[in-house]
Amino acid sequence: LPKVQTKLFINGKWTDGDNKETKDIVNPANGEVIAKIAQAGPNETKKAIKAAKEAFPDWAKMELADRVKLLHKIADLMEEKADTLAKIMTLEQGKPLKESKGEVLTGAENFRFAAEEARRLYGETIPAPNNHAFIVKKQPIGVVAAITPWNFPGGMVTRKLAPALATGNTIVLKPSGDTPLSALAIFEIFEEAGLPKGVANIVMGSSKEIGETLTDSDDVRKLTFTGSTKVGQTLFKQSAETLKKISLELGGHAPFIVFDDANLDAAVNDLVAAKFRNNGQVCVSPNRIFVAKEIKEKFTKALVAKVEQLKVGNGLDDVNVGPLIREDAIDKIDKQLKNATDKGAKVLTGGGRLTGSDYDKGNFYKPTVLDNVTREMDIFYEETFGPVIPLITFETEDEAIEMANDSEFGLASYFYTKDLARVEKVGAALEYGMVGANEIAISNPETPFGGVKHSGFGRENGHYGMEEYIQVKFINLKYRD
């Protein structure tokens, strides 16, 4: 493991928790403990909130050009240290090194985009009566609490912190307890770049204790969370008393529809790329694959052949797919597959844990294709978060849309067709915050990312993401003698 901090960072200082407790960070590829991380409780979290609150006035009024310059310096350092940051990420999370490096570089781009977009947070002057000016200003909110997940331990940190900092807010970050090292490495870069003390603080520890301390605090004016719908609902309820501004990016169960006129090669290649990125541990991963009856056999044959070419192993090696994050992830997939096969589904390839040699040391699972999936099976409605492609046959366009929308979630969706009229109809009909039409790249620094229904609300990325971290103030000015 490259050298990286393992302590809390509060008010510009690296510090142990009050109780001196630590938590082991385990490499999911081999079960080895790679670091021991300091743990915080309510007291340390309150100190971090206090530091952020005290740092806010000076940070908010810093000359915009200076703040922009500082954020570009952070991006420069992330790019300069990309290989080291990528190795840290792969060791703690498991994903292949090339995916980790891509995540780091996207993180740097998040800072660049947010820095430049901060120059374009335009206010407004509204036509007013004579001798008046109706002025609308956009101002930072204050202290932002950010809680990030383990599946993108660097990307989710930069996606939240870049716009929050760019718009003049201060931060208390609580990263995932499974993968805090990437966040800590980013905070080392903050320190090296010269971010003023107290502007960004990081605490690791009990999700329940830290979460409750953040939501209970009136000094925290904004909460941003990426994670499960269940936890998001809890945080939403806990934040009600203090009336925080909130954005939640929660569960997803993305449909992927292949119509009979689709470019099959593109659909197969994109499906495999999207499904097995990060071993399927992605909120926008295709989870229900709807294939037109007319092309089902041809599509399935090409898909299985492609999946069987995937190489699974330690992310530091030349592989396509790494390990799952924890043992319980394997248990969940096994349970879903048993439920499905008991009810008539058929495993075409894969379908179990990878064993033997180095596989026995880690949380490895065979890339799996499951056919004959129906609504009677748990996998139709439950997010898998693993390397399983469930195939579902449809006969009509309306049937495909209806089945795709038959979910409590509404984050990402995908469909493949050459028919422009169908693109318009299906794109409008899908009840999802994001739609990929003949494309899987739905997350970009410039474009809004977020969902509807039980996938949460609020947007990240693009100018919509910047707006999540500002508040609007109206000034009615009357000119008097």
What are these regions (language model features)?
Residues 1-29:
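Hydrophobic face of amphipathic alpha-helices that form TPR/SEL1-like repeat modules
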Residues 230-374, 437:
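ALDH superfamily catalytic-core signature
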Residues 31, 67, 89, 111, ...:
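Residue-level signal for inorganic ion chemistry
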Residues 34-40, 55-61, 146, 256-259, ...:
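Short, well-ordered beta-strand elements within core beta-sheets of diverse protein domains
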Residues 32-121, 131:
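Glycine-rich loop-to-alpha-helix module at the N-terminal edge of alpha/beta enzyme cores
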Residues 30-36, 220, 257, 311, ...:
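Conserved C-terminal structural/oligomerization subdomain of aldehyde/semialdehyde dehydrogenase
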Residues 56, 60, 75-82, 86, ...:
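Structural signal for hydrophobic packing residues in well-ordered secondary-structure cores
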Residues 123-266, 318, 394:
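Rossmann-like NAD(P) dinucleotide-binding subdomain of oxidoreductase/dehydrogenase enzymes
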